[in-house]
């Protein structure tokens, strides 16, 4: 009995280390529902707006906010610190307009429990008996009070701290413009500031950058040559610490990206939560005082105020009301004039594409070099727009390097416009299905795209505070950025629900050829229905064709059946896209085809989870040896397609009723079905 208990205990310890080792990156755009992923202590709390408030305007208090799971900073058995990258947005609102303190720090520590630490100049990291810290730690401090004990250079500086509050290197706070001009930056000015910290383990160099904007500066504010291998342990905790002294400030964290496998993405500052700043309250009091004085001023000043009021009223009348979903999404709402100018009046030259949902335009935001994609919802798709807006209020918080980011929106009367990251290389389907594409994707590029999409789907299913089912995974909704990374886009059909709960049944929406058979039978959503669609994408990338090709030979009509027949006959190379000219990694191609068949199985119990798919693609698991049959059927007897469509992959339907064909073994149903009821185009 005791031996069994010991084995179980060892297994649990192993699984815990395995989970922590898989965590390479995370992203928070606001923290409204992030409390399960954070360890907060001291006076730290999550404000109603979704920002972390580390300290209040109370003297001599501390606050900590750490990611709840440890991060592996060294490979197993190797004493070498790995590279890491993080970006985060902070704001410090002082108790008095020009006086506050003490500051905050990004910290990497052996434990998230620092409750024995002191406030004031120790920033909640150390106490007076631990200045020579025996347990190693690393921090980047944003200090707003000069302390002679630690030889601070001034009361507005950034410093790198290693095992001590006396900075190894520090510099006055500031940032660099694109023309290399350095601008001063006041940390405790109540302004949102973004920070980037990048450690390169090969160069053994640490870079710190600041900016009050979304774009990452090219030049570093601090660049320090250091080997962190002797500082960081195998597993450490990452987070933030702040404190107040005789002077106090409210210290806020508005968003946070962390990455152990590449460069952390920059945060879009307009999309972050608002600061519940006491400065605003003081401003209102000052405005009331000014208003009282202005009543005693001359008739001329009064006339100017009246004219200004009329102008504001007219402008407010022209704007649509702000609804609850907009407040939940975040503060950034683009003006209609701004987006009209960005897209050259929504001109045809800027048109990227159109569909049942409306049109998408390329735009360049005024006063910026940033390109965006602007989706203008058509009036014909007005039904369902309110439902879609309620989804946007949640989906707008999603942030992952393999998702197309929603930057903001605009409402003007009945118009609804959504603003996304611009993807300069278009969608994956153009490269796979166009007869004469300008560029033929190499296998290396295809495999990279597949892994990116899988990572994005894993984040949707498991990595956010709610489970997100995309419901329309297909090559046309995989967009490619400037570096040909695959990003999942078009969340117009997505559904969200709490982890562990039952999403229930819903109407069947999606694209013909990508719908899981159990979805079309019962309408019940699961993450496995997304896995089924991803299986089609895997086979599309390997074979260079759509799931259903009505112009193909009868035996090649249904891609899954065709691939399976070649697999059984040992002619699997025959299905590989001929445009690759045989230049591919055969082991990777076979693995992708195996995974495609597994994900496309009619039985959801056979399909892997996206976490398992990612581990296969990252070669953490060997390629599956046994691939069960996907369940055959005679597609000629089981389909009813419009011959003029050219490809069933172009259908975007929702199914009122469907008659299922039973395969040769008469025990399963196929994903290919004929409609016995009517088919309508879903307004998107």
UniProtKB/Swiss-Prot annotation:
UniProt-annotated binding residues for ATP: 352-360, 375
Region (Legume-lectin like): 25-259
Mutant lacking the gene: phenotype: Increased susceptibility to the oomycetes Phytophthora brassicae and Phytophthora capsici and to the bacteria Pseudomonas syringae, characterized by stronger necrotic symptoms and higher bacterial proliferation.
Glycosylation positions in this chain: 37, 127, 132, 179, 259
A Pfam family hit: Lectin_legB
UniProt family annotation: In the C-terminal section; belongs to the protein kinase superfamily. Ser/Thr protein kinase family. In the N-terminal section; belongs to the leguminous lectin family.
Protein name: L-type lectin-domain containing receptor kinase S.4
């Amino acid at each position: 009995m005791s031996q069994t208990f010991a084995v179980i205990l060892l297994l649990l310890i192993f699984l815990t280390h395995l989970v922590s080792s898989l965590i390479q990156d995370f992203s928070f755009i606001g923290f409204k529902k992030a409390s399960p992923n954070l360890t907060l202590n001291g006076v730290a709390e999550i404000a109603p707006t979704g920002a972390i408030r580390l300290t209040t305007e109370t003297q001599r208090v501390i606050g900590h906010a750490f990611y709840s799971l440890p991060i592996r900073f060294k490979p197993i058995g190797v004493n070498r610190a790995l590279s890491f990258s993080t970006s985060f947005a902070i704001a410090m609102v002082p108790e008095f307009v020009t006086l506050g303190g003490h500051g905050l720090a990004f910290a990497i520590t052996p434990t998230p429990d620092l409750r024995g630490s002191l406030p004031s100049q120790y920033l909640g990291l150390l106490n007076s008996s631990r200045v020579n810290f025996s347990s190693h730690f690393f921090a980047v401090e944003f200090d707003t009070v000069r302390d002679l004990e630690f030889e601070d250079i001034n009361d507005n500086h950034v410093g790198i701290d290693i095992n001590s509050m006396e900075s190894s290197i520090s510099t006055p706070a500031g940032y660099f413009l694109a023309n290399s001009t350095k601008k001063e930056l006041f940390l405790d000015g109540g302004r949102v500031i973004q920070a980037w910290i990048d450690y390169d383990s090969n160069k053994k160099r640490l870079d710190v950058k600041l900016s009050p904007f979304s774009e990452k500066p090219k030049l570093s504010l601090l660049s320090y040559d250091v080997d962190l291998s002797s500082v960081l342990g195998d597993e450490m905790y990452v987070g933030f610490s702040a404190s107040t002294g005789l002077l106090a400030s409210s210290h806020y964290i508005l968003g946070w990206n962390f990455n152990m496998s590449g460069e952390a993405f920059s945060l879009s500052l307009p999309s972050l939560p608002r600061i519940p700043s006491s400065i605003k309250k003081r401003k209102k009091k000052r405005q009331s005082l000014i208003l009282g004085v202005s009543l005693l001023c001359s008739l001329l000043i009064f006339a100017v105020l009246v004219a200004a009021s009329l102008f504001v009223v007219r402008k407010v009348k022209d704007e649509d009301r702000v609804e609850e979903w907009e407040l939940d999404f975040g503060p950034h709402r683009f003006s209609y004039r701004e987006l009209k100018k960005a897209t050259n009046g929504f001109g045809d030259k800027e048109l990227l594409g159109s569909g049942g949902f409306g049109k998408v335009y390329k735009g360049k935001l005024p006063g910026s070099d940033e390109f965006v994609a602007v989706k203008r919802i058509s009036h014909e798709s007005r039904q369902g727009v309110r439902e879609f807006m309620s989804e946007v209020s949640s989906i707008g918080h999603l942030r992952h390097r393999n998702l197309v980011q929603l930057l903001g929106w605009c409402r003007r009367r009945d118009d609804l416009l959504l603003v996304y990251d611009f993807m300069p290389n278009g969608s994956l389907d153009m490269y796979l299905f166009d007869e004469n594409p300008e560029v033929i994707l190499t296998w290396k590029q295809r495999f990279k795209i597949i892994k990116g999409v899988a990572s994005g789907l894993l984040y949707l299913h498991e990595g956010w505070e709610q489970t997100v089912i995309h419901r329309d995974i297909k090559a046309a909704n995989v967009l490619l950025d400037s570096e040909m990374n695959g990003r999942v886009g078009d969340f117009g059909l997505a559904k969200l629900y709490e982890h562990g709960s039952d999403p229930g049944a819903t109407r069947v929406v999606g694209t013909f050829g990508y719908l899981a058979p159990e979805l079309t039978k019962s309408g019940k959503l699961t993450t496995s229905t997304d896995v089924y669609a991803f299986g089609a994408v895997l086979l599309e990338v390997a074979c260079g064709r759509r799931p259903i090709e009505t112009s193909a030979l009868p035996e090649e009509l249904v891609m899954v059946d065709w691939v399976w027949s070649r697999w059984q006959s040992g002619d699997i190379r025959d299905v590989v896209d001929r445009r690759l000219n045989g230049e591919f990694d055969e082991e990777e191609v076979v693995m992708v085809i195996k995974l495609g068949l597994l994900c496309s199985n009619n039985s959801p119990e056979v399909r892997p989870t996206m976490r398992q798919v990612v581990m296969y693609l990252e070669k953490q698991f060997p390629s599956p040896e046994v691939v069960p049959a996907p369940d055959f059927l005679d597609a000629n007897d089981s389909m009813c397609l419009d011959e003029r469509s050219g490809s069933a992959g172009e259908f975007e339907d929702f199914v009122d009723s469907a008659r299922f064909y039973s395969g040769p073994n008469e025990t399963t149903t196929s994903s290919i079905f004929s409609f016995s009821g009517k088919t309508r185009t879903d307004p998107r």
